[in-house]
Amino acid sequence: METRNNIVNTLASNLRFLRINTQVEEPITGKVKFMSQRQLAELMGSTCTQQVSKFELGTNIMSSYQTYKISKIFDISIDKLFDAELVKSVYKKTIKQNIYAE
């Protein structure tokens, strides 16, 4: 049986893996860059990049709502977020940044 720390560390590793393998296309310039912690925080509805950093380090635990938002942002099932094999998979995604999003 997995311990709480194993689960938190798996989720943290998977979040970082998904973020660094996701690109964001800027709407005006069309430039494509890898997703930053700031961009992920904004997509999650927050302005606090420190929170994303703590999630990726496993020092803070995501709420069920935050986990749900992550699954929607990266278009991945919630159970896959807790799969230790995810970091061994091939995952690439491009998101078009919406300058009109609230």
Give the label of every model feature segment.
Residues 1-33:
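A short, Lys/Arg-rich alpha-helix, primarily the initiator
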Residues 2-5, 72, 82-102:
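Short, charged recognition helix plus adjacent turn
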Residues 13, 34-35, 47, 62-65:
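Residue-level signal for the short linker/turn that defines the boundary of a DNA-recognition helix
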Residues 20, 45, 57-59, 86:
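Residue-level detection of the helix-turn-helix DNA-binding "recognition helix"
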Residues 24-54:
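Short alpha-helical DNA-recognition segment
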Residues 32, 44, 59-62, 73:
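Helix-turn-helix/winged-helix DNA-binding modules
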Residues 50-54, 65, 83:
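Base-recognition residues in the alpha-helical recognition helix of bacterial helix-turn-helix
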Residues 63-80:
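DNA major-groove recognition helix of helix-turn-helix/homeodomain DNA-binding modules
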